[in-house]
A protein has these predicted regions:
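Feature for extracytoplasmic/surface-facing segments of secreted or surface-associated proteins
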Residues: 62-250
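Exposed beta-strand face motif in extracellular beta-rich ectodomains
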Residues: 38-42, 111-112
Length: 250
């Protein structure tokens, strides 16, 4: 990130002596590089034979990240970075809305990248209270928010996500778009299938609970519960967990 500081007429003679450490700026602009996220203070000092003056400006340094919300593509989802783990978009947290292809751009911060609600692009089904997430632990240019990253977000050892669900080790689930890459008849389709299965289970249980209790719970707790069962079984067997079995569902 660069801050352009335009030279201003100071009223001081240009031939005046400069204090040690000051750089003369006569015409044009000077680039100030922002390397640190958060507030950065820049000071412009004018110094000449008649005296001097300084002005400071505080500039927030931040990076954006692009991403996509995918079960199928989910449009019009509320996308936000949950920094305090209350699973709501607070006024001080970055938020945006996914476009018709599930894509978004958002200001990066560590926390949980959350997608809430929206519409399934293919079926035009409303996904009220569907919450999927991606735990943010470092900036990258692109993030995928999927049912699989939702399970990984709640795992004690997220590095086990591929082996626990039988996903090929070559796939980075945090940046891989399952919809754009499906149709290979192999490892990509398997990932897409696992995501769909997780969503169907979580969304169905959420809707049953909300209808019975007249509540508006999200799928967050169901993804947490699935994660606990997946990790428990994977720890006991050291083999990938089949989430299609009756034993897992019950």
């Amino acid at each position: 990130m660069k801050l352009k500081i335009s030279s201003l007429s100071s009223g001081y003679p240009s031939q005046g002596s400069l204090l040690p450490g000051l750089i003369p700026l006569e015409n044009g602009t000077e680039d100030a590089i922002i390397n640190t996220p958060g507030n950065n203070t820049f000071t412009l000092t004018c110094q000449g034979s008649g005296g001097g003056n300084s002005k400071s400006v505080v500039v927030e340094g931040y990076r954006n990240t692009d991403g996509v919300v995918v079960d199928g593509y989910i449009s019009s989802a509320e996308v936000f970075v949950d920094e305090d783990e209350d699973w709501m978009a607070d006024s001080n947290e970055s938020s945006t809305t996914s476009d018709n292809n599930g894509k978004f751009t958002i200001k990066y911060a560590d926390g949980y990248l959350v997608s809430l609600g929206g519409t399934d692009l293919d079926s035009q089904t409303l996904l009220d209270n569907l919450l999927i997430t991606h735990k943010l632990t470092g900036h990258t240019d692109f993030k995928a928010v999927t049912p699989v990253t939702s399970v990984a977000a709640f795992m004690a050892t997220p590095a086990n996500i591929n082996t626990a669900l039988g996903i090929d080790a070559s796939i980075d689930v945090y940046t891989f778009d399952p919809v754009a890459n499906k149709g290979d008849g192999g490892i990509n389709d398997y990932l897409y299938e696992k995501g769909n299965q997780l969503t169907v289970l979580a969304f169905t249980l959420q809707n049953i609970t909300n209808n019975l209790n007249t509540t508006t719970e999200t799928t967050q707790d169901y993804f947490k519960a699935f994660t606990e069962e997946i990790e428990k079984e994977y720890t006991e067997t050291s083999t990938n967990v089949d989430i299609e079995t009756e034993a897992f569902v019950t």
